[in-house]
Regions:
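Structural motif
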Residues: 31-36, 58-62, 96-100, 120, ...
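An aromatic- and histidine-rich active-site surface loop
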Residues: 38-39, 96-111
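Short, charged/polar "capping" segments at the starts of alpha-helices
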Residues: 38-41, 62-68, 103-104, 149-152, ...
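Active-site-proximal region of nucleotide-activated glycan assembly enzymes
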Residues: 71, 77, 93-97, 112-175
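A short, aliphatic-rich alpha-helical micro-motif
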Residues: 87-89, 135, 183
Length: 202
């Protein structure tokens, strides 16, 4: 049964891959949103981008929550096709909150000069929760605090990286405040600390 399901998923992924290749030329910007948990952090950035551009999303989980015609989602289940998608990607920019580019099946494309931009899903120390080579292959890494900015510059110098840090707002906080505006501030702070602890433990 498991073998049959794997074969079915493989053929479904091939169809999805073909659809992706047909549509890809209509996009400059893409997001790799690995799962629903990461979507919580990337959605504010996706929403911002779709105000001006069409956005392509690559995911490993079903994320059918967007009602926006500017968003096209491609969901892949099998690792072979997932890696093939990354290796053949033809975009100008790919945003993600998944680290370890080139250290897993998440690879840089061989078919374009795509720029890879890392967006933070945690405000904690970069040295504390990530592998030492987690950001080696990104062209730009978001920092959402002065401490993260200094940390990445230290990492960059130590590992002789070409990628640059950039400061920007942590849009997840802004979105969370908006969604939880009816709750007392103490509950909001507790909730944010709890989510931060979850990220750290993962």
């Amino acid at each position: 049964m498991t073998s049959s399901l794997s074969i079915i998923n493989f053929y479904i992924d091939i169809v999805q891959f073909i659809k992706l290749k047909i549509k890809e030329k209509n996009f400059e910007i893409g997001f790799f949103c690995e799962n629903k948990f990461i979507l919580n952090y990337l959605k504010p950035y996706i929403d911002n981008k779709t105000k001006k551009k069409k956005v392509l999303i690559i995911t490993f989980e079903n994320l059918n929550i967007f009602q926006n015609e500017e968003v096209s989602i491609f969901f892949f289940k099998t690792n072979f096709i997932r890696e093939l998608v990354f290796l053949t990607l033809n975009l100008k920019y790919l945003y993600t909150s998944t680290p370890d580019l080139e250290n897993s099946l998440f690879k840089k494309t061989k078919f374009s000069n795509c720029k890879y931009i890392y967006l933070q899903h945690s405000p904690v120390s970069l040295n504390l929760i990530y592998r030492e080579n987690a950001f080696d292959h990104f062209d730009a890494v978001q920092t959402i605090s002065s401490y993260q900015y200094l940390e990445f510059n230290e990492i960059k110098e130590l590992r002789k990286l070409k990628g640059r840090p950039f400061k920007s707002k942590y849009l997840f906080i802004k979105e969370t405040k908006k969604n939880l505006s009816i709750q007392p501030k103490k509950k909001l702070i507790f909730w944010l600390l709890h989510r931060g602890t979850q990220v750290f433990m993962n």
